[in-house]
């Protein structure tokens, strides 16, 4: 199940039934009528300056964990794309292009949205393989329409299948140890294997004579290493605890000494196996790829430490996805992932408290306004009372004069009546 604070995706329907998967966070899990329910908070617009959506309650069938991306996508492959900060939508790869950004080159993809048939451009980080979360496992949608295959009677609807059931297991080259519990994702295997086969003993290739002439000593060392790897592989099942992990390349670069002497390497020791490089990279580039991953890992640790409370939620999700990619290569990412989840939970608490503060300030402002209005009314009543006092004083003065006049009339009346004839 999904515990509170877990980043998930929630299905939402738009445009007459199109399903969009929206980044969200689980706030609370509870049971209702023997069925698990979840209160989730929408994270798609949290930092985009738009009004936050209210929390909503969904059932388990509307939730899924966050799937990971891959390094490359094929033409006509079904994918999901992150569009307009709203959520992940179904599309199809129509082409790709390398673009230079400063000194770096980045791959962009042309994707046609299945719902609108519009073709848009996305960077690689905004793409993911199209997968279905069923019965607690990921099921992969085949990357090409079956209509491309001649003589096939299958329907497109049958293209959803369990990758672990239908894909043959990936067998590494002789002598290479694949550490347990570090399986290469089936979707990635199919793509990589479609591009090239796994490297085998190089002595049978057409260029061996040239390589031996250039550097026979290196070839001898290479054959010796392969023999040693074969010996290690043959006893792997008998001695699982004593097996020494063998990398898919030989450490030749001096930068390894620098990396292993870094303080962060001692604080957060790592023993990556880099086994996916067997299918993702050429043999001559594996070591450089591994060094790049080591530097990336340490750089990501620094980015986690530098996170600010007002950073976009998408940045947190990007870090989580990056660590998930490194985990495939054997990196221990439990600590940074746990810290990111904790920070996301704190961000959610901060958001709640911010809303509570706004509500409290609004109530205070309303009360202050009522108080000011009452004070204004009091002052107005005081002014009216003062004017009334003046009018009362004038009335009393007038009444006193009238009383005096009545007395004068009375005296005159008596004097007149009693006057002699």
Curated annotation (Swiss-Prot):
Q: Which InterPro entries match?
A: Agenet-like_dom, Agenet_dom_plant, DUF724
Q: What is this protein called?
A: DUF724 domain-containing protein 8
Return the SMART domains for the record. Answer: Agenet (SM00743)
| Positions with biased composition (Polar residues) | 149-165, 199-213
* Species of origin: Arabidopsis thaliana
Residue runs in coiled coils: 361-397
Would you tell me the Gene Ontology cellular component terms?
A: nucleus
| Lineage of the species this protein comes from | Eukaryota, Viridiplantae, Streptophyta, Embryophyta, Tracheophyta
**Function in brief:** May be involved in the polar growth of plant cells via transportation of RNAs.
